[in-house]
Regions:
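Beta-sandwich/jelly-roll carbohydrate-recognition scaffolds of carbohydrate-active enzymes
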Residues: 2-160
C-alpha cells in the first residue's frame, strides 16, 4: 500500500480504517487498544502473504469511489469493472439506544450489493493474531464462520 488516504469508521467502542478499494486494512478487536485483527496496513510488499485482511475484490476493477453518507459515519465504497459491472460496499459500526442507554457493540457491519451489470466479486476474510504474525484458525458453522484469536477474542462473521 502506498497511500495513507484511509476512511475511518467506528462507534466509540471499535474502529476500522478502510482503503479506497474497500479493504479493511486496520482494526483492533474487541477494543481500540487490543490486537489488530485486521492489519494488512502493515504488509510490506504486494507479494507478502495476505493475512489480517477483509477485502471485497471486484474482478476486472478499473476504478473506485468512496464517500460518507451525509451527516453520518456510514462509509460507502463503489467499485466499477471494465464490463460495466459495479458493487457498492457499505461499512459502519452500529451505535444505538437500548434499554434507555447508548449501546456501542464491538461490531462492524459490512454489506456488499451489486448496483450495475453482473459483477464478480471475491471476498477475502483472513483475520490475524499477533499484529499479523499468524492467521486465526477458522471454524465453520451453518451460516457463520468463527475465528478465535490467540488473545482469546473470537471474531464471528455471519452472512445471509
Amino acid at each position: 500500500m502506498s497511500t495513507l488516504e484511509l476512511a475511518a469508521i467506528g462507534n466509540a467502542a471499535v474502529s476500522a480504517l478502510v482503503d479506497a478499494n474497500g479493504e479493511i486494512v486496520w482494526s483492533c478487536m474487541p477494543r481500540p487498544d487490543a490486537d489488530a485483527i485486521f492489519c494488512s496496513l502493515l504488509r510490506g510488499t504486494a507479494d507478502a502473504p495476505r493475512i489480517g485482511c477483509f477485502a471485497v475484490e471486484l474482478l476486472g476493477q478499473v476504478r473506485s469511489e468512496q464517500e460518507y453518507v451525509a451527516n453520518t459515519p456510514v462509509l460507502v465504497t463503489r467499485l466499477f469493472d471494465a464490463g460495466g459491472g459495479a458493487v457498492e460496499i457499505t461499512d459502519f459500526a452500529p451505535r444505538f439506544r437500548q434499554f434507555g442507554r447508548l449501546f456501542a457493540p464491538s461490531q462492524l457491519v459490512r454489506t456488499v450489493r451489486p448496483i450495475a451489470g453482473s459483477p464478480r466479486v471475491r471476498i477475502q476474510l483472513r483475520p490475524a493474531s499477533g499484529y499479523g504474525r499468524e492467521p486465526c484458525a477458522r471454524i465453520a458453522g451453518s451460516n457463520h464462520v468463527r475465528y478465535p484469536s490467540e488473545g482469546g477474542y473470537v471474531l464471528r462473521a455471519t452472512t445471509d
